[in-house]
Amino acid sequence: MTKLDELIQELCPNGVKYQKLKDISEMKRGTSMTKKNTREGDIPVISGGREPAYWCDTYNRDGETITVAGSGAGAGYLQYWTIPIFVCDAFSIKGTKIIETKYLYYYLENMQEYIYSTKKGGGVPHVHISSIENVKIPVPPLPVQREIVRVLDNFAELTAELTAELTARKKQYEYYRDSLLTFGVHRRGTVETKWRTLGEVCNSIADGDHMPPPKSDSGIPFITISNITEQNKVDFSNTMFVPCAYYNALAEKRKPQKGDILYTVVGSYGIPVCIENETEFVFQRHIAILRPKMQIINPRYMYHAMQTTAFKAQADKAAKGAAQKTISLHSLSEMTLPVPSLEVQERLIDVLDHFDAICSDLNIGLPAEIEARKKQYEYYRDMLLTFAAADDIILTDRQTDRQTDRQTDRQ
């Protein structure tokens, strides 16, 4: 029997009462404020998004606080805070003498999708206090609440540790890759290593057809930017198709070949993919295709160099536009990278491919472990916070089972 079972059996063997959210918590609307009327500081301003709208030098909530985003695409998004914050286009919820704020947060988090569903308004959706104030919350004794919070905190901490480890490993890999590909040379170059533009080291730089291609039930796979994964691969598992005749009519520079580099240039720009197999496919205009000059640069080396921090900084500078950032083919052709001899490139490829393999294992293993932990956390959260209603009393699943056993024993 777990500690939680013991507490339930001792403190609430006959069930748990439930009450409306507004009756057991302190719910307050935010205070209107604009950035231009504030001074910059270190206090997060909570508004309609998932991240602070900006930072100011004053606060209107302190201690444990739950916030619910008030408007926009993120309306209804729940967050838990333990630092001073300024609640603006949002509302806050705090616990009282009979309910712990963190317990309340976990219970409401379990209802996140329902809270999203209460959005009202056409152009700019809103979630108001009135949207959820009548939600009924099981209120077990405080020791039971605290034990539930302790268990769920442990699961959340395990997930956070795994996520932090994955982030640290990625940064470590990026550091070594950047160090290997810096060469300690200036942009003007040395005898051994020169900085060259992509236009200089590529036979062609093109993008996909700017006209929507004809679709078919079978034929040649047509990939979009959503088929480019964060692991720098092309995912062919969910693609549309175009007729073979359409593919055959394309210019040769738009037909991917082994050794070509794909590079996303619109929206989620800056993701390179090295084509390692002779696979026929076509792609949308949001993706560029670069054909390296093999006598100057090895495609695998070019692929690694296009992932460095220095190259990404060039991409950020070249990306233009408000709604969707776009890197033009001209700007792409002028972006530079260090090009040593082919012999040096080969040695670097061996090292970087080894790093890549390690990171790929991490990118598969750790995210899978993180996902498993999240599912485990959600399972226990649902189990711990799911209560079966019976008249004016809420019983836990365990209590319902015990009650059924007692009734069976009497028969």
Functional labels for PLM-detected ranges:
Residues 1-411:
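Charged, alpha-helix-forming regions
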